[in-house]
Swiss-Prot record:
Residues annotated as domain t-SNARE coiled-coil homology: 196-258
Residues recorded with modification Phosphoserine: 65, 77, 114, 163, 182, 185, 204, 210
Protein's recorded name: Synaptosomal-associated protein 29
CDD domains the UniProt entry points to: SNARE_SNAP29C (cd15856), SNARE_SNAP29N (cd15887)
Polar residues biased stretches: 131-142
An example Gene Ontology CC term for this record: Golgi membrane
PROSITE patterns given in the database record: T_SNARE
Compartments, record wording: Cytoplasm; Golgi apparatus membrane; Cytoplasmic vesicle, Autophagosome membrane; Cell projection, Cilium membrane
UniProt-listed InterPro entries: T_SNARE_dom (IPR000727)
Amino acid sequence: MSAYPRSYNPFDEDAEDEDARPAPWSDSRDLADGPGAPADRQQALRQEVLRRAEATAASTGRSLSLMYESERIGVVSAEELVRQRGALERTEKMVDKMEQDLKTSQKHINSIKSVFGGLVNYFRSKPAETPSAQNGTLTPQPSGRLKDAINSSKEQEAQYQASHPNLRKLQDSDSIPGGAGSAVSSEAYPRNPHLRACHQRIDSNLDELSVGLGRLKDIALGIQTEIDEQDDILDRLTSKVDKLDVSITSTERKVRQL
């Protein structure tokens, strides 16, 4: 027995399937052809260009913020290196003073071996006291490159005004990026005010990024120079401490022999 009624037509299912197929997908941005289609396409293109310009301006703004944050961290690290240099220099001065005092003690020990002659030698060869540098305020002197980089970063606003390419380009008309349009800015940027503002903001951000990255590079080079100089101080200090340790051992041996 057939599972379908006698009046059933199997080809009717194919017709129903074709009717049930989804309509082709169409983007809402697709514009129909017609008398106003070219103008609509131009308007859509303008909106797309403006959207991309705004996204680019926002991206350069975020990059600028990251650059400023990196520069701030670089300045903090550089200033910490300067304080560390001050500590190393004070330590070196103290080691020098200890070595001088130890030499004086050794002379006293040698003079004790001869009672009378020792007294004469003591008063005659007493070394002149040198002013103690660590008692005063010792101002650390960082490397010239690092000092210049720190000062440059702290004066970044004045430096930016002096080195901004757009300001030099537009100084004859006294215009600034994002300000009133001049003859130069009208030629350099689009006529659409919103698009022109985006382009000016992008140019301003890129120019400031260029100057800021230059400052950041100077900070990095200054930090490297400062680290190299502090390595020299550490090597010098290590040698002095080793020499002082030998002198202390020798002095202790002489004291026990008295």
